[in-house]
């Protein structure tokens, strides 16, 4: 994927492709995918402009999470959903939120990602969206 225009100008790395389940409004239509990616503004510490708003370190050299939408499996046609700012930023620590991985099965959708914490650690965290909730959201 090409680098982004703003917060992800230094790096864009797709970490996961989640095919949208064929449920609800997506049951009969063309299918698509959500691509999760890690982006970074810079891969080194940036000196901030003293007249600009100070930002946490995570906005300069740690990866934050973004998303794209792609029709079918045509990853080359993917369009950014997080054009001017990341979609996934931890409310804790440096804001780091990266390395998304998903699994969709009959039980629903499982997602894991690395998330910055107040104590500076960055553990893997997980969420499960049950199948009935996936169907409700896509209907």
Task: Go through each PLM region and give its residues.
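Short glycine-rich, acidic/polar surface loops and turns
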Residues: 97-100
């Amino acid at each position: 994927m090409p680098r982004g225009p703003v917060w992800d100008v230094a790096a864009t790395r797709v970490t996961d492709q989640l095919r949208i389940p064929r449920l609800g409004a997506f049951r009969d239509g063309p299918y698509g995918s959500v691509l999760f990616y890690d982006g970074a503004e810079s891969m080194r510490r940036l000196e901030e402009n003293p007249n600009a708003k100070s930002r946490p370190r995570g906005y300069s050299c740690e990866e934050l999470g973004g998303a794209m939408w792609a029709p079918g499996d045509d990853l080359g046609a993917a369009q950014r959903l997080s054009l001017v700012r990341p979609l996934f930023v931890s409310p804790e620590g440096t804001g780091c939120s990266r390395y998304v991985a998903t699994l969709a099965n009959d039980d629903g959708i499982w997602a894991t990602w690395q998330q910055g914490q107040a104590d500076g650690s960055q553990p893997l965290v997980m969420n499960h969206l049950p199948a009935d909730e996936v169907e409700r959201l896509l209907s």
